[in-house]
Structures are given as structure tokens and as C-alpha cells.
Curated annotation (Swiss-Prot):
Keyword Amino-acid biosynthesis (UniProt): no
GO cellular component, one term: host cell presynaptic membrane
Protein name: Mu-theraphotoxin-Hhn2n
Keywords on record: Amidation, Disulfide bond, Ion channel impairing toxin, Knottin, Neurotoxin, Presynaptic neurotoxin, Secreted, Signal, Toxin, Voltage-gated sodium channel impairing toxin
Places the protein is found: Secreted
Subunit structure and binding partners: Monomer.
UniProt family annotation: Belongs to the neurotoxin 10 (Hwtx-1) family. 15 (Hntx-3) subfamily.
Domain writeup: The presence of a 'disulfide through disulfide knot' structurally defines this protein as a knottin.
Length: 83
């Protein structure tokens, strides 16, 4: 009986410590998220010489990036599986 009470108390203390640690990490999360969003926006401004996944393309022209192929049915770049 005593051992189970100590075990339950230790579990509650552990739960409190883990909750406190995760809460302190969550305070930094919005700042990190915003910095990643703005970093992605800067990257979008650069133009590529090829078209990526689901970009529209013209079949027969080699417009898609490596490992992608222009689908003649849908007319967008898809992953080329080699079939």
C-alpha cells in the first residue's frame, strides 16, 4: 500500500516536470515558426530553371526538374517512376 502511494506520487511529480518542460519549449515555438515561414517566403522569390511537382507543363518539352516527368494526360509534372 505504501509503495503504491509513493509510486503514484512519483508519477505525478514526473508528469508535472514533463508538463513544465514542454510548456517552456512552447513559448519559443511561435518565434521559430515565424522565422521559418519568412525564410520560406524568401526562397519562393528565387526562380528555378525547371518545374517541380504538380507544376503545369507541355508534354514533349523537357521542362520538369530531374526525377519528374510531364504527364501527357494531366499536363503537370509528376514523379517519374521509370515505367
Amino acid at each position: 500500500m505504501k509503495a503504491s502511494m509513493y509510486l503514484a506520487l512519483a508519477g505525478l511529480v514526473l508528469l508535472f516536470v514533463v508538463g513544465y518542460a514542454s510548456e517552456s519549449e512552447e513559448k519559443e515555438f511561435p518565434r521559430e515558426l515565424l522565422s521559418k515561414i519568412f525564410a520560406v517566403d524568401d526562397f519562393k522569390g528565387e526562380e528555378r530553371g525547371c518545374k517541380g511537382f504538380s507544376d503545369s507543363c507541355t508534354p514533349g518539352k523537357n521542362e520538369c526538374c530531374p526525377n519528374y516527368a510531364c504527364s501527357s494526360k494531366h499536363k503537370w509534372c509528376k514523379v517519374y517512376l521509370g515505367k
